Each structure stands twice: as C-alpha cells, then as structure tokens.
Amino acid sequence: MGSSSSKSSSSVTVASSIDYKAKPTIDELGTSNYSGGLEVSKNLLDFNLGEKPCPLKSVVQDQFTISNSSKTKLKFHFEPLQPKEFQLSFSPTSGSLDKGKSKTIKVKLMVNQKINTNHKVVLRVEGGASHFLTVKIRCETGVFGVDPNTLEHVEDEGFRVPYILALMKRSLIDNGGLQQEGIFRLAGEQTEIKRLKEAMNRNDFTSSTDINTVASLIKIWYRELPTPILNSIPTEKIFYSTDIDECVQSAKNLPEPQKSLLDWLMHLLLMVSSFSDVNKMTAQNLAIVVAPNLYDVSSSNPMEGLVLSQKCVQFLHNVLSHKVAVHKRESVAYEVLS
C-alpha cells in the first residue's frame, strides 16, 4: 500500500523489464552472484511467541546469525527504526564481518501499546544487497492480523468470508467506491486508517465515507494475515505458472479459508475493474497495487524477493484477467438469451 494520499488524476502505468512468460534463470534470481555475500539465518522474528500475545511494557528477545560467505570483509548496519508503538533494538547495530566469519545478532523488543503488525526492518550491506527482516508483533485480539478461522463469518454474494470484509465492502460500494478514480491505488489518510482500524478491532465500526481509507484497510487486512494468501501456493507455482489456466488452477487448489478469501477479493476487484473507464483501475493496475498485500516476499536473497514480487503481480493479473473474461462471456450470453 502506498503512503501518498495525493489524488492524482492520471492512471497507473506499468513499466517492467521482467519477461513474465520466461522462466527465471539462476542469474535472474540472483543465486549465482549472491553466494558470495551476507547470509541471514532467518528473516522472521517472532520472539518465540508463536501465536501467543506479546506482553506490554516487557522486553522479549530473539536472535539470528549473519554469515559472510564472500571473499572480502563486509560492513553492515540496521536502518534506524523507532516507531512510537514499540522499541526495537539490534545488538550490534552495525559492524564488520571478516570473510568466512559469523556473528550473532541479538534483538530486543518492548511494545508500548496493543498492536498487530508485521514490521519490516532493513539490514544494509555496504556495497551489497539489502536484507529485509519481518518483525511479527501480535498483542491484541481483533479482526486484523489474526487467524481468519477465528472470526465471525457471513455469506457475501456466494462467498463465506469474515464479517469485517463484507462490512468494508458494503461501505465501499455504498459510498461510490467502485467509481472512485484510483480506488485501491490512492491511500487513505494515515490518522483515519489508524482510527478506523482500532474501531474495527473493538467491533465498533459500521461504515465510513472515506472510501480510500476503507480500500486501504481491505489491503491491510489481507497483508496482516498470519499466512498471506499466496504464500499457501508453492513458490515454484508462482514463478513458473506463466499460463493463465495454470494460475487459475493454482488458485482453485488453495486450501480453505485462503481459497474463499481470494475468490471474494477477486470478485470485488472484478466489480472495480468493470468501471475502469471511470476509475482508471484496470485488471493490470489492480494487480499491481493489490498483489504486494497477498504475499510475504521476505527472503535471504533480495534479488529473488524482487523477482518474486513481480511474478506475484503477474500471477494475480492472470487470475483476475480470467475472471474478467468469464464475466464478459457470461454477460454476452445473457444479452443474447434476453
């Protein structure tokens, strides 16, 4: 989700040097030139809590190892990060690592208020690629960042989904969201996003006229799932399913509740794309802004993560394009029969 709330009137354009139809080579994934860099033992920091809530005002700890498999000394540092909701520290915060050596990084976290989030931390390597670590924080029950099976479900246009999704969709539609230019691309105001998210977690939300905020919260809901939707599909299926039918079949083979959650979302995006002449959000544009919320691309190999991110966009575009094509055929058939 983007951070800008500017209401630009231009449509999204796409420019990519990646050939989606070509299978990625070893060089494309960065494997061949990455073996001589900094390696990280794990990318998810959950402080050994699993699904247990993180305590407030108490320090929890985790650790991981970085190793230098290059032929030269490497310098590294963690980018400064001090959100007001929590304190996070790495020890050491910077340093150097001789070739062939390893170092243990100790991590301390203290949460000041109840939040559910997956926070990204950047580990920079001088003259090399960056690493992205995910800090998993779960402090409260609610509707964001929790197992969807624990939420109240309803039937929404043939899909069984958590009640909060149906509520946000109704708010979006009732307030003209389907016709809003840049819907799902333009971000809502951060203060309003936070306020409404907290209200939803308290089960104290009915509707909102700020449709960009509601659209942002739908993306956030998917992004903060304990297991992102597309992570339930084998990685090789994302990389190599260049054929639309293969992508559709992979989506159909998803386990529940991921399958219903993806089907519901695709139906909503289909509705949005049907007004693309007004809202400027085609299937391709929607895939670009929504796909990053459906897959956690954290990887010890940043280049692989970059390629995988683009493959996820193409995967989602293929699935959505199929639904658009089916909808058009059914509409034509209905008109003929009428």
UniProtKB/Swiss-Prot annotation:
Domain Rho-GAP residue range list: 149-327
A GO CC term assigned to this protein in UniProt: cytoplasm
Site (Arginine finger): R185
Superkingdom, taxonomy of origin: Eukaryota
Gene Ontology biological-process annotations: signal transduction
Pfam families xrefs: Ig_CFAP65_4th (PF24507), RhoGAP (PF00620)
Major localisation: cytoplasm
Functional description taken from the UniProt entry: Rho GTPase-activating protein involved in the signal transduction pathway.
Name by which UniProt lists this protein: Rho GTPase-activating protein gacA
Organism of provenance: Dictyostelium discoideum
